[in-house]
Amino acid sequence: MRLAGLEQGLAAAPDRLGIYLGSGEGQQDFESFTRMMMASIEGESLNVATFTRLGLETLHPLTEVEQEPNMPAGHLAALFDAQGPNLNCLTACAASSQAIGEATELVRRGDADVMLSGGTHSMIHPFGVTGFNLLTALSTRNDEPARASRPFDNDRDGFVLGEGAAMVVLEELEHARARGATIYGEVLGYGSTADAFRITDTHPEGRGATSCIKMALDDAGLGRDDIDYINAHGTSTSVNDRVESLAIKKVFEERAYKIPVSSTKSMMGHLIAAAGATEVIVSLLAIRDGVLPPTINYETPDPDCDLDYIPNAAREAPCQRVLSNSFGFGGQNISLILGRFADA
């Protein structure tokens, strides 16, 4: 809020201010539920009456409400008196990028003057870690945690879970000008597709990712020569990194080898629903500062991942437009194109 110049309020009519948030499951009280479960076991069965009684005696009255995934957006609306559109996006790893894309559309069509948009997720708990382990999605380099996340490297074996939240302020241009806002960039294009394949795997030929990138380029009115940097989804899993590289090559053809690509998940881990919004902010800083973030732990090239992944060290380079990809479990694909704002 401070960076957006909104510390003293949002300078927008409450009914013209909205929230669009990408998130996962809501607040989960695993410890209380586990204690209740253990105390309710009789022989090999769960005594439902005992479980219910213990719940009524020990759980917070808002337990059911707070575990709903739309609660973060609801809390933000109350905090900022945002009486405009209030929406929540539940598309796994693509959620916060999709929230930003859809919030942009709300502003474009005049439904709001200001949208607070981004994502939040907290998955570092027993259920989250166990679940991703069952999917064999996590790295097993427990003896080398700092080197475990290695997108596009030949020896990658899964991602490292991260946690966090990231938000941006999306604002109608004349509204932003009127209050003298500092504009960090603009959303030029937005693409959203589905693989319609397996919920745990991206399509092996990059069908959805390819069409998503093309859709974002078309929405922005840009061609393959107009992108200066790609902030990849880059999860450090065997399939994702290969397929994303393939999709980039299908869209950009020979120019794919000249566009710097990196995955900041190599440094931050995978924030799941919050990943895309975090990477949007990284992309905007790359545009502002002319510094492209690296892919760390890139040591052994993979023949199927043969692009310029900005290995191991940031690179100074002029940057006008960025493609940021987010691909989620379930087959959701989101591509955003961000650009430097040129005030005519």
Give a label for each model feature.
Residues 1-7, 69-80, 86-121, 160-181, ...:
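Active-site-proximal alpha-helical scaffold in enzymes
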Residues 1-14, 176-180, 213-229, 251-255:
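Phosphate/pyrophosphate-binding loops at sites that engage ATP/ADP/AMP, CoA/4′-phosphopantetheine
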Residues 111-157, 190-204, 232-241, 258-308:
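Acyl-CoA/ACP chain-elongation machinery
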Residues 143-220, 228-229, 343-344:
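Condensing-enzyme catalytic core mediating Claisen C-C bond formation in acyl metabolism
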Residues 12-14, 63-70, 87-95, 263-275, ...:
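Active-site nucleophile and cofactor-binding loops and adjacent substrate-binding regions
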Residues 28-45, 107-109, 129-142, 204-205, ...:
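A glycine- and small-aliphatic-rich helix-loop capping segment at beta-alpha/alpha-beta transitions
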Residues 1-80, 84-90, 120-129, 224-240:
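Conserved beta-ketoacyl condensing-enzyme motif
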Residues 1, 19, 76, 96, ...:
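Conserved small-residue
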